[in-house]
Amino acid sequence: MLPRAVVLLSLTPFFAQAACPDWPVPRATDEITALQQQLQRWDSSYYRDGRSLVADELYDQARQRLLTWRQCFPQAPRAMDQPLLGAGGSIRHPIPHTGVEKLADANAVTGWLKGRDDIWAQPKVDGVAVTLIYHRGQFQQALSRGDGVHGHDWTRAAWQIEAIPKRLPRPVDLLLQGELYLRLEQHVQARSGSLKARNRVAGWMARKQLTAAEAAQIGLFVWDWPQGPATLSERLEQLADLGFAEPREYSRPVGGFADAQQWRARWYRSPLPFASDGIILRQSRRPAAERWQAKAPYWIAAWKYPYAQVLASVRQVDFRIGRTGRITPLLEIEPVTLDDRQIRRVSLGSLQRWRSLDIVPGDQVAISLAGLSIPRLDEVVLRSTLRQSIQPPREADFHFLSCWQPSPGCEEQFLARLTWLSSKQGLNLQNIGSRTWARLVETGRIKGLLDWLTLDQAELANIAGFGDRSSKRLLESLHSARQQPFPRWLKALGIPPSGSADLSGPWQALAMKNSLDWQNEAGIGAERAAQLVAFFRAPEVLALQGALNSAGIEGF
C-alpha cells in the first residue's frame, strides 16, 4: 500500500486542459474546502486505519481536481494539505518506506524510461505494506507502513501468517519491505477488479487477534530488500533462496516502452494470485538504504491500469419520458473518457434512485461501464455545497395511456410513441426514426399518432430537408404499414405486454374481454389484465381504432 499523495507529480500535465468551474470566489472557497475535507477523511482512514474508503483511481482524480480548482481560484484561502498527518505509529522504521511516482499515460512512461537502463517490471500488488525484520535467520518483528517513517507493531498477527517465513535457511540479519495481500485464485483484474481485497487484509491486521482462517488467506509479496545486493536480479535470486520466491516469478526485465506496455496488458488481463492495480517500474540499482526517505524516489514509478471508474462533474439533471410514461433521470456530465469512449450522460434508471442519491448539478460522481459498454453511475463521491432545488415531472401525469398528442408537456412521450411505432418492434418502417418524426411534428404535419396515414407528396415538399427522392422513400415506407398484420399494429399502438395471448383479432373480440378473460391467458396476472382492459377502453385508443378502421386496416 504505497502513499497516494505523490500522484500530483505526474498527473498534472494530463489534466492541464481541465476547464475551470464558473464560480464566484465564495462558492469556489466552499467547494475547495469541502473537497479537501473529504480527502482528509479518506487519508485518515487509509493511513491511520489501513482502510480504503474510495478506489485509488477516484482518490487520484479527486486530489488532481483539488489542484485544478486551486489553480483556477488562487485568491481562495488555502489550508495546509498533509495527507499523512496522524498516519504514523509508535515504532520508527529502521529504513523508511518510500512512495512511488504515478505515471499518468504512455507519454509519461516513455519519458520516465528515457535514458534509463536495467529496468524491471512487477505487478503493483494491491495489499497493505509491511516491514519484516529477521535476526540471525529468525523472524523478529513486523511493522505497518504508517506514514513511511513510523509504523504500528504487527508482529503478533504476523506470527499467525504462514506466508511469512519464521525461520530462514541461513542465519542472516534481514530487513524486507513488501505487501500483505489477499490470496485469490485465477484472479483477472480486468474482469473482476480489486474486490476490496486490500480492505479485508487491512481490517484483519488492525484487529487484536487474527484467526487461523484469516491468516491462511494472506499472502506475501516482497518488493524490496533495501540492504540487499546491488542489482535486482541478484536480489531476486537470493530472496528466492531464502524462501521468498514470488518476486522472482513476477519480475520481468524491460527493454523499452513496448515491454512495459506488454507486461501491463498481460498482468491486467491474465490470471494472478492477487489483486493488482498497475505495474511497478524499478531501476535495478538504487542509492544506499541510508539515503532513503518517505517520499517518491527517482528509481521507482507506477503505471496504473486503465481507469475502471472516472470522476465526473454533474452539469445538470434531465428527465426523459418514455413511450409508457416511465420517467428516467439522466445526468448530463462534463465529458469523461472510459475505455476510449467519451461519455457525456448517464442514466439513473428510476426516479426512486435519483431521489435516494439526491444528485444535483455540481456533484462529483463515479462513473464506470456496465458490461464494458453501458455507462453506469456507481456512487456520489462529493456533494456540491450548493444544493439546487430540482422539480421532476409529476409521475401521476405520465403513464401508458397518457400523451397521444404533442400537447404542452407531452412532446417527449408522444415522440417516443411514434419512434416505437416505426421501430422493428412496431411496424418496422424503413428509414424512419425519431429525427424524421420530430421534424414532422415540429412543422405541424403530425398532431396525432396516425396523422401520417394521410401525408402526401405536396405536404412533404413544403418541409425543409425533404426533397423529391427522400419524400418518395418516406411515403413508400409509410404506405407499407398498411400491409402489416393486425397483431403487429397492436404492438405498434402500444398494447401492454400480453404474455402468450392470441392477438390475431379482430379488435372487437379483444375489446370485449374482461379482466378474468385476460387472466386466463398464460403469463397475464391481475395487474396486467387491468391494463389490457383499460387499453381497449381508453377513449384515445378507441379513436385510433376508428381511424384505422376508416383507413381499411385489417382487423380494426
Swiss-Prot record:
Its catalytic activity?
Answer: NAD(+) + (deoxyribonucleotide)n-3'-hydroxyl + 5'-phospho-(deoxyribonucleotide)m = (deoxyribonucleotide)n+m + AMP + beta-nicotinamide D-nucleotide
Keywords on record: DNA damage, DNA repair, DNA replication, Ligase, NAD
- UniProt-listed GO biological process terms: DNA repair; DNA replication
Q: Which Pfam families match?
A: DNA_ligase_aden (PF01653), DNA_ligase_OB (PF03120)
For the protein in the UniProt heading, the enzyme class is ligase
In which domain of life is the source organism classified? Bacteria
**Entry EC number(s):** 6.5.1.2
Per the Swiss-Prot or TrEMBL record, the active site comprises K124 (n6-amp-lysine intermediate)
- Gene3D superfamilies noted in UniProt: 5' to 3' exonuclease, C-terminal subdomain (1.10.150.20), DNA ligase/mRNA capping enzyme (3.30.470.30), Helix hairpin bin (1.10.287.610), Nucleic acid-binding proteins (2.40.50.140)
Q: Keyword Acetylation on this protein?
A: no
GO function terms (MF aspect): DNA ligase (NAD+) activity
- Is the keyword DNA damage assigned to this protein? yes
Q: What's this chain's function?
A: Catalyzes the formation of phosphodiester linkages between 5'-phosphoryl and 3'-hydroxyl groups in double-stranded DNA using NAD as a coenzyme and as the energy source for the reaction.
- Family membership noted in the UniProt record: Belongs to the NAD-dependent DNA ligase family. LigB subfamily.
Q: What is this protein called?
A: DNA ligase B
